[in-house]
Structures are given as structure tokens and as C-alpha cells.
Amino acid sequence: MIRPSAPAHRPGRGRPSRRCGDPPPARLRQGIDEFNRGQFFEQHETLELEWIEEPDPVRYLYQGILQVGVGFEHLRRGNAYGARRLWRRGIGYLEPFRGGCMGVDVDRLIADTERCLAELERVGDSGLERFDGSLIPRVEWLAGSD
């Protein structure tokens, strides 16, 4: 895998992107469809391609969605630590895009992921079989964006 050089922009600092008003690229739509079908490994592969190729800070939107999804793959595999770490990191990447970006309802994804963090804390690392799977979010589109 090719790793891009470190960008000047870091999540949580400055404006998220001048491109947030643009329509979502095809791979973002595909990755979100995969996320929403519970295909978390596949969404990682799809969104990683978009993230690597994107020079604009909107790449952190892709990275945030990607990491939240990979967190659910970790949960599925019984790795509570990995799930927690990736959800928190993903939320950090998504924070600058609150209010929505490229039609993605970022606020809802953050809130839903935070509910999953709280549920994971409730059941504990050794109680993953009690995790309420109905809390696993979908990435939703803002009204008029789908």
C-alpha cells in the first residue's frame, strides 16, 4: 500500500474543506453503501483508494468514515480495544465536518458512533456478546443529497 506524505492540514484544525459542497464522488458512495451493508473490510478498501488520491482536506472525511467502519470490523472479530481506538480516531477525523460534507450526515454518524462507544463501555471488553448490534450505524445522507 502506498502511504501519502503527511499533509499540512491536520484533523480538527482550520476549515474542513472547500469541497464539502461538491457532490460525493462515486467511490465515496460505494464505500458508504458497503459500510451500510456491514461490509466493513470492503468499505475500508474502497475509501482508502479515495483517501490516498485526494489532496484536499476532504480526505479526512473519507478517513473518518473508513476508521469508524474498521472499528466495527474489530468489534465483529472480538477486539474491543481496536474498536474503541478506531471509533475515537474516526470521530476525531469527522469532527471538522460537523454540519455535513458532500451530503454525508456527519453529525449523525458521530452521535451514533458515540452511542456505540457508550454501549461498549456498558458491556465491557469481556461482554462483547451483549453488545446491542442494533446500534451499529448507517452512514446517512442529508436531506436532498441521496
Regions found by a protein language model. Give the residues of each.
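N-terminal alpha-helical interaction modules that lie
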Residues: 1-54, 93-146
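Residue signature of alpha-solenoid helical repeat architecture, marking inter-repeat boundaries
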Residues: 21, 59-61
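Short, solvent-exposed positions on alpha-helices
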Residues: 41, 59, 81-85
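Short Lys/Arg-rich amphipathic alpha-helical segments
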Residues: 63-65, 78-79
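TPR/TPR-like (Sel1-like) alpha-helical repeat modules
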Residues: 80-98
